[in-house]
Amino acid sequence: MTLSDNPKVVIATPLGDIKMEIYADKAPVTSENFLRYVDDGLYDGTFFFRTVTMENQPDSPVKIEVIQGGMVPKDRAYPSTYPPIEHETTEMTGLRHVDGAISMARMKPGSATSSFFICIGDQPELDYGGKRNPDRQGFAAFGQVVEGMGVVREIQMRPHDDQRLEPPIDILRVSRTG
């Protein structure tokens, strides 16, 4: 795949659009999982529900800055998530958690489903070997914001209670483009 062959996705929010390139060529398992949620409309009507700033993680020795979204609402009639996917580390893909990187949230390796986050600033502690997760496997980066980082930063600065956005920011629609 060339750069132009990679899928493009737009997240529509009331604050504006976030346009992303999905690196299906470098992170095929993670990209396919994310695009399955997109294509099936499962992100439509969900939320950005978490913001992590330097100020709201006082007990964390390793600080990061991200916004997190993609939880499928519990009132959906169909299953909320597909099975968890294999963990594609940044060591495997060559991708890094740089400003605007999109990555899958997880607890343990192989537990990622629908929840994703977008990095604000470079976040090397989220890469393979980084110290944010004790297992040091990092998180599975799979794309990059190409337009709309102003919207991402605006979401990050919205009112929050601890790390929970209050109110959460609506994800109106997530769809492929061009």
Model-identified regions with their sequence ranges:
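Cyclophilin-like peptidyl-prolyl cis-trans isomerases
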Residues: 1-178
